[in-house]
């Protein structure tokens, strides 16, 4: 069966389950796997207990740990469920998961409606134009209110929901849904425990008499929305003709794929009610790989040259690695979304991001709780591959003869760091393993050894990012460690030019001495992602022997590592070696290296040194009533407001704010806006620190 499904991409859905942390994402995903498992194994006597055991174990470990993408089958269609990260602060990771999905199911808590975190995830999906259907979950919960939740989708998200189901009963009496497309009732009358075996079957009945008026009212709204998509449907509708189920579904699909509306369904995943119709809606309304625009990438040699790849097996092979995970038996698994072409196990491909050859080892499709080996990969699908040695998250794999880069991987430099000290020798070894594994998975995570203290310093994109990395070290790798306070990664530079600075290094202590004489010029230069320092040699007539010139450069580079104001690395400096002198016996590479380092330090003191700090590009989305407070708070943090605009029911404020002022911002924003505003933050640029603030930092560093 699997092979039949694979070839017809119209029958494939690559989806994510998006939700607030408590809206029931795990339970919903589990139930999807459970029901699709039953359907996939028709004719097999099912041992309910064994499946539930497996689900409980999954729940304990968290479903996202076992697999970043799970394949299941529903009514002869294939659904690949891609894990969407729970933390929206990691834009790189969120971007990547949203990039490999074609559609999503947004799960809402039927009592709480749209919560702040669901708002954040929703806005992120808006940004990438991901078509969605909404599942109002927990309809059996005390206080659950379907109509309230739909209102919050309109008011808090500014979205256009299209109600295609209504609940029958509520709280403890919730027993089914009214299907407004086919105008029928679906009921699950299992025992009080919501028996799963009974949950797998439901009855199709007449709409209850007491809900007929409500159903007619919402059906009329549905038909009106649907009829507006097409002139012939509009004519039919106003002519009093009945629209067919096929016509209604086709129109809802068209509107959903274009993100014009979001179909809303309801149920209780925990009580096994409403999950199967939701799966039907995934197939009926969410896009297949053929419904989304073809993939764009650029030429390996020319970033300006755009290349298009269609989801077709006749096109050259291209795929994006979107997750690297460690499997208990197979070791390193790389999850890939194949965008074009096909390739067999054992083939050689090229990692065009890094320019390295890779060999595809075993290929799996992850079927809920087991790996299903396949011989080859096909466009439009998600696979897990073994054997890729150099490929990390975000790399492109492609045909060596027809190369493409799908994602330009210029990751922002880390702006925040924290020292981490293992408690024991054993922890030190485990820390090494943890760092290596985490760096493979997360390209924005860096690490270095502090030469002076011997501590390991980990660097990341923000406070929350570091918290989660440290938490993962403890949880997944059992590293017990003391963690320091987060530190901002300041830099130093110069604003003035020193045209000539002479320095002589001379040491005579019996035997051969040390001698090096140099004259250098230093001046500011523009910092780019590729270049923060430049060295130029203008010595003529061999006054400094050629073999010693690289030593002067190396000495200056050493001095750049520890700035003269507060010991931070220096950037944006051009140094030119103008002149010098050497001694036949006493000169050496080491003597010229010391001279380079000392000359630079002395010259830099005269070149108007200044401190630089990372400025963050901050975007806050807030309901209008809190806008004044949010702007006032950003101003008090030395922020500069760049723009204010409207976006689907909220105000969007963009500002540049120094990172040092953003510690603890998440809590302050939550309290100022009752948890309704959300923000994202990414590195913008380095800027000069105001003198009063700089003096304080310099004093603090000298005091320590």
UniProtKB/Swiss-Prot annotation:
Report any Pfam family annotated for this entry.
GTP_EFTU
**Mind listing the GO biological process terms from this record?**
ribosome disassembly
The answer to whether the entry has keyword RNA-binding is no
Which molecular-function annotation in GO is an example for this chain?
Answer: GTPase activity
- Binding sites annotated in the UniProt record for GTP: 19-26, 83-87, 137-140
The domain of life for this entry's organism is: Bacteria
- What sequence ranges are listed for the domain tr-type G? 10-290
Which compartments is it annotated to reside in? Answer: Cytoplasm
Q: Name one GO cellular component term.
A: cytoplasm
Q: Which keywords, in A-to-Z order, does the entry hold?
A: Cytoplasm, Elongation factor, GTP-binding, Nucleotide-binding, Protein biosynthesis
Q: Which SUPFAM superfamilies match?
A: EF-G C-terminal domain-like, P-loop containing nucleoside triphosphate hydrolases, Ribosomal protein S5 domain 2-like, Translation proteins
Task: Identify the InterPro entries for this entry.
Answer: EFG_II, EFG_III, EFG_III/V, EFG_IV, EFG_V, EFG_V-like, EFTu-like_2, G_TR_CS
Please describe what this protein does.
Answer: Catalyzes the GTP-dependent ribosomal translocation step during translation elongation. During this step, the ribosome changes from the pre-translocational (PRE) to the post-translocational (POST) state as the newly formed A-site-bound peptidyl-tRNA and P-site-bound deacylated tRNA move to the P and E sites, respectively. Catalyzes the coordinated movement of the two tRNA molecules, the mRNA and conformational changes in the ribosome.
Family recorded in the similarity comment: Belongs to the TRAFAC class translation factor GTPase superfamily. Classic translation factor GTPase family. EF-G/EF-2 subfamily.
- PANTHER family cross-referenced by the UniProt entry: RIBOSOME-RELEASING FACTOR 2, MITOCHONDRIAL, TRANSLATION ELONGATION FACTOR G-RELATED
Cross-referenced NCBIfam families, in alphabetical order? EF-G (TIGR00484), PRK12740.1-5 (NF009381), small_GTP (TIGR00231)
The protein's name is: Elongation factor G
